[in-house]
Amino acid sequence: MRHRHGLRKLNRTSSHRLAMLRNMSNSLLQHELIKTTVPKAKELRKVVEPLITLAKKDTVANRRLAFARLRDRDMVTKLFNELGPRFATRPGGYTRILKFGFRQGDNAPMALVELLDRPEVAEAVEVDGAAE
């Protein structure tokens, strides 16, 4: 019976799953928005949210714990210098999962995973006067 097992295997070995979630965590922390399948997104949320909670208190021990999970010094620095202070007053729920349709090849349900309170990106505004 599969009662009370806390994770999805995602058709991968444990080492492959760990490496994939580590890479996806680094990508999410770097870009603050990634596109993936819904089951991977739900598993990624279980990895990233505790890391952000860890980053709210900047200690050497917490940095080492985060580095043990991410294995990327630049992402640990961003996590503690930018993301930790950004979410200091939020008591949890740092990510949002938005359903994003289905993948073309295999019809897998896709999702966008984003960090909340992202800074707005200024989009280029087209000038209508140039077309005249």
From Swiss-Prot:
One GO location term (cellular component): cytosolic large ribosomal subunit
Biological process (GO), any one: translation
Keyword Transferase carried by entry: no
UniProt-listed InterPro entries: Ribosomal_bL17, Ribosomal_bL17_CS, Ribosomal_bL17_sf
GO molecular function, one term: structural constituent of ribosome
Keyword line: Ribonucleoprotein, Ribosomal protein
Family according to the record: Belongs to the bacterial ribosomal protein bL17 family.
Subunit structure: Part of the 50S ribosomal subunit. Contacts protein L32.
Protein name as annotated: Large ribosomal subunit protein bL17
Species whose genome carries this gene: Ralstonia pickettii (strain 12J)
